[in-house]
Amino acid sequence: MSQKRQTKFQNGKSKTSENSSAKREKGMVVSGKEIYDAVGRSKFVLENLRHYTVHPNLAQYYKPLKATALQKFLAQNRKTTSFMLKVTEYDQDKTLLIMTNNPPPCSITHQDKESAPKYFSKDLLLKVMESHHQHKPTEDLWLPRMPQKKKLRSKLKPIFPLTLSDDPTSKREQWFRFSTDNDFKSEGKYSKVYALRMQKKTYPQLTFAPVHERASKKSASERPISKVIREPLTLASLLEEMPTRTAPGESAFRNGRAPQWIIKKATVIG
């Protein structure tokens, strides 16, 4: 029995080795340079397949995404917060150092007598100590109440006298009254203002002369004409106001001419 089992096992091994070799022969074997097939060279296999088997480095072709506005804002906010935190820590350390080297004076405990006069005068310290000793806990610390003034009447609301029918002698005041006929004697200007508004809307480029110019024109036209008889302007009246002055010249046109010196003979000395 043992011999039969050994022969079967050997036969099985030989069969498996044959099958594996046959599979290898049928399959594709990739060497370093060429590709072989059991039947022969396949026409469907690329010649430069070895160049495509290695994955290329795509990092050089990668374009990073641009940061959004929110990401930029958050990054700037983080930087600002970290900077403020560092400044605060530095200020705390600086303040602690200053307070350690220069402690402020205490008016209650006079342990540090040398530093007290640097900050406060002696008179002020004496006043503080006196007020501290004179203070009583039962003393009322509340300030006195201010006297309540009467409510002031607004200037926009006039006060009208009021007389009662039962008691005509009593005098009262109120902020309103009934309108009378005398209130409606003034000229109404609503229609004029409305007409001006409509004119401005229809003609926006229209310019109006200022009020003072129109008033000056009206006043100039309304000036009274004087009835005084005036004499005509003559040469004699002008000579009375501005008398003539003698000046060098010829005939009657000598007035106003600039003086001239005519040289008849001139000798040049060389």
From Swiss-Prot:
Residues 1-20 have a biased composition (Polar residues). Residues 1-27 are annotated as: Disordered. It comes from the Eukaryota. This is Testis-specific gene 13 protein. It comes from Macaca fascicularis. The gene is TSGA13.
